[in-house]
Amino acid sequence: RARRVLNEWHLQDFADRSFGTLSDGERKRTQIARAVMPDPELLLLDEPVASLDLAAREQTIKIIGAYASAPEAPAIIMVTHHLEEIPAGFTHALIMSEGRVFAAGPIESTITSEKISEAFGLPITVDSVDNRYRARAH
């Protein structure tokens, strides 16, 4: 099972290395892989790609998206402050504003320019390319 999880999270080349020798991106993926080892019913990811460089961030987002799309995947709650970090394949979203739930539901009807603009009090354009979101203030 451990080898399969290492392969799923693209960590097979690091199986024999100590944690301290891994890059930040490799460490984040290792921590997530460790969390999925016991086949959880719920996986909570709190800003899993924060502080990663572009390559590590995109690789990790892609892996999380693929994992989330698998039929046997647990329910996943992912906290992020950046729409660009939402993996393709996520189906629902919740927007918080001032410590309260502002909007929640299917991602296509929740992550919209109107709702994001209202939640943040700033005119923001939201669009999606290949099921990945991005936001731009104007």
Segments from the language model and where they lie:
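Conserved ABC ATPase "signature" region
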Residues: 1-14
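Catalytic Walker B motif of ABC-type/P-loop ATPase nucleotide-binding domains
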Residues: 43-47
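H-loop/switch region of ABC-family ATPase nucleotide-binding domains
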Residues: 80-81
